[in-house]
């Protein structure tokens, strides 16, 4: 017997949960978007779909892993991160501003330093240079300038005439003691390393024509470090101060560095002689400044066959010398390159022989120092010992200055040639 639609609806309502009665908007999950066939219009019992729909959404939301705290706490956390980011941005902006201020300050300091250097140079070449330099040094005493080389070295303006820095040395007669014909030699300050311990500062002096000298109290000599004036001294630093360059310089081999290092490690003349016999004819190259110099190892035994061997012993005040190698095409003079033989004596001192005069000139205290300083001391136009011009016999020929710092403008040379004679 067929059931009426009302009975069918009642049976369905008794067996199916109330919140899952199918309708157009309440679709079971297995339909996947496909709606079930609708009931006849005569069925009046329908439940609102939002009950089961809400429960299914609640069940699906229960699988999400929410962090501890409510949604408002999450919003507050995001606001805190934004505030932290803003604080970091403000810190970066403050640092950038401080860097810009520091750069502006450095730029201003550099500009003032350049102006002071230029003023010092102008005072050193005036007609009354001594008086102008004294006034300037007393006015800016204590001012510090940074040197380009070595790193960490500074020049400090200082009135050494008042502090009596030289002690036993007569400051007022320096030009007569060390130089040839300069009219004045005035101390203007000192150079020293930052936070140096056990190293006294080196006095800096300016002579006629603006030339800059450094006084070495160890060997009691003056070293010409800049012929171009005070500006060149600040720009080049102490590169032309041979003792410091021999101590702090570096060796750069181009080719055959193993051969050059073997010579650097040799401790005495016997080891050098054996090395020369072993490496005879070997070639290596190294750099002296911007020049790459080619060096050929010689047979040490040929030293004693050279007619100038006896003169080399006298000129260098040595008991024995050994000719170890020859350096090709050395640019020691303008528009001229020379092949210079290298000698080493029993104490390790290195000398270079001029190929035309056959005279030996002191170069360095050892082969390591020679590869660092190169031919800076060759023909000795940079180092001036006490009384080297007034009493040249007091200095060994290999260490003696060979020319006046004024070079072609030497007053003694011009007087000797009769250039001052009246016509």
Curated annotation (Swiss-Prot):
Pfam family, one: US22
GO cellular component entries: viral tegument
Composition bias type Polar residues, residue spans: 1-12
Subcellular location(s) of the protein: Virion tegument
Keyword Lyase attributed: no
Keyword Secreted: no
Key words, A-Z: Virion, Virion tegument
Main localization, broad class: virion
Family per record: Belongs to the herpesviridae US22 family.
Protein name: Tegument protein UL43
